[in-house]
Curated annotation (Swiss-Prot):
This is UPF0178 protein bll3966. Transmembrane segments: none annotated. NCBIfam families: PRK00124.1. Signal peptide: none annotated. Belongs to the UPF0178 family. It comes from Bradyrhizobium diazoefficiens (strain JCM 10833 / BCRC 13528 / IAM 13628 / NBRC 14792 / USDA 110).
């Protein structure tokens, strides 16, 4: 855990829960970087910054992956980006509320790659299910719990550090 404050990075181009992220972030006083390849409208608030990462295919993903670190939260449905951020130590949540973890990301990435191969071979024609109202609720709960967990880890780390310096 680092001493720099927690930040939420949003892979924003197709993110259906941006408004929910803003509400939770403002309630917790956590800064948000809304990263997109194109212009995207964000609320006027000092805690919310818009990042135009450029038009390159993975420009937004690269921008986020280069900055994500332990204590940060990344919101993305992009599985390769999620993998990079999990490896960097960030907490990663999909817009449907599903967490990507060190334990789950390998299998998730393998399934994604398999489905991509099957689609390109014409074996699978459907995609993921549609975003549902319950996904929004699950996401809100997951983001709030993740921010609380990070805050507890910071408090515990500070207490441990203080105790070891006294002992």
């Amino acid at each position: 855990m680092t001493d720099t404050p927690t930040r939420i990075y949003v892979d924003a181009d197709a993110c259906p829960v941006k408004d929910e992220i803003y509400r939770v972030a403002l309630r917790h006083s956590v800064p948000v970087s809304v990263v997109a390849g194109n212009f995207i409208r964000v609320p006027q608030d000092p805690l919310i910054e818009r990042i135009a990462a450029g038009a390159g295919m993975d420009a937004a993903d690269d921008w986020i992956a280069e900055r994500a670190r332990p204590g940060d939260v990344v919101v993305t449905s992009d599985i390769p980006l999620a993998s990079r951020c999990v490896k960097a130590g960030a907490d990663v949540i999909a817009p449907n509320g599903k967490p990507f973890t060190e334990q789950s990301i390998g299998m998730t990435l393998a399934v994604r790659n398999l489905m991509t191969d099957l689609r390109s071979a014409g074996e699978v024609t459907g995609g993921p299910r549609s975003f549902a109202p319950r996904d929004r609720s699950t996401f809100l709960s997951a983001l709030d719990q993740t921010l609380r967990r990070i805050q507890r880890r910071r408090i515990d780390a500070a207490a441990t550090s203080q105790n070891s310096s006294q002992g």
